[in-house]
């Protein structure tokens, strides 16, 4: 049974990774990759991915749909909570003033946290409500593409 569960979870993780990278997000798997990405000039949207139901049913669809907008971040990146622990911990160091939360979204500008959309703003909400929250932040912090 343990072997079956591990295979099942590996499949879930693989699918979760594929969904977010297919949406145009770059996976960051090490602390060094996080530092390189999050210290770049411009705006960055970080999606903290997760295997929970609200990640698959709400956060990842919102991550995909939110960026189809006139104003959007310069780069889209993702870390995977519970999987890429070093990268996730390092990304959370940039989210000053916010407790760890997954799934979640962070908008950074020139390496500084501007806005978080935390799990409590995702779980129990419709994907389009999360899209609206993200696009509201894009209006405030991002340039027109």
UniProtKB/Swiss-Prot annotation:
Induction or repression: Expression is up-regulated by cumene hydroperoxide (CHP).
GO terms under biological process: cell redox homeostasis; response to hydroperoxide; response to oxidative stress
Disruption phenotype: Sensitive to cumene hydroperoxide (CHP) as indicated by growth inhibition assay. No effect on growth after NaOCl treatment.
Keyword entries, A-Z: Disulfide bond, Oxidoreductase, Redox-active center
Residues at the catalytic site: 52 (nucleophile), 54 (nucleophile)
Modification note: N-terminal Cys of the CXC active site motif can react with bacillithiol (BSH) to form mixed disulfides. S-bacillithiolation protects Cys residues against overoxidation by acting as a redox switch in response to oxidative stress.
Pfam families xref list: Disulph_isomer
Sample GO molecular function, one term: oxidoreductase activity
Coiled coil residues, start to end: none
Sites bearing S-bacillithiol cysteine disulfide, chain numbering: 52
Motif CXC active site motif: where in chain: 52-54
Disulfide cross-links: 52-54
Keyword Oxidoreductase: yes
Family assignment from sequence similarity: Belongs to the bacilliredoxin family.
UniProt subunit comment: Interacts with BrxC.
Physiological role: S-bacillithiolation is the formation of mixed disulfide bonds between protein thiols and the general thiol reductant bacillithiol (BSH) under oxidative stress. BSH is an equivalent of glutathione (GSH) in Firmicutes. This protein is a dithiol bacilliredoxin, which debacillithiolates (removes BSH) the S-bacillithiolated OhrR (OhrR-SSB) in vitro and in vivo NaOCl-generated S-bacillithiolated MetE (MetE-SSB). Involved in maintaining redox homeostasis in response to disulfide stress conditions.
Protein name, as recorded: Bacilliredoxin BrxB
Taxonomy of the source species: Bacteria, Bacillati, Bacillota, Bacilli, Bacillales
Gene from which the chain derives: brxB
């Amino acid at each position: 049974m343990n072997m079956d569960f591990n295979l099942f979870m590996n499949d879930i993780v693989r699918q979760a990774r594929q969904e977010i990278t297919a949406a145009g997000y770059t996976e960051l798997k090490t602390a060094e990759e996080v530092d390189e990405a999050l210290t770049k000039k411009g705006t960055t949207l970080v999606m903290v991915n997760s295997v929970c139901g609200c990640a698959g049913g709400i956060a990842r669809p919102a991550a995909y749909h939110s960026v189809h907008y006139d104003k959007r971040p310069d780069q889209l990146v993702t870390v995977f909570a519970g999987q890429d622990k070093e990268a996730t911990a390092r990304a959370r160091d940039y989210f000053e003033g916010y407790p760890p939360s997954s799934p979640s979204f962070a908008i950074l500008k020139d390496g500084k946290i501007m806005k978080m959309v935390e799990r409590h703003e995702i779980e129990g909400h419709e994907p389009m409500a999360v899209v609206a929250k993200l696009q509201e932040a894009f209006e405030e912090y991002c340039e027109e593409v």
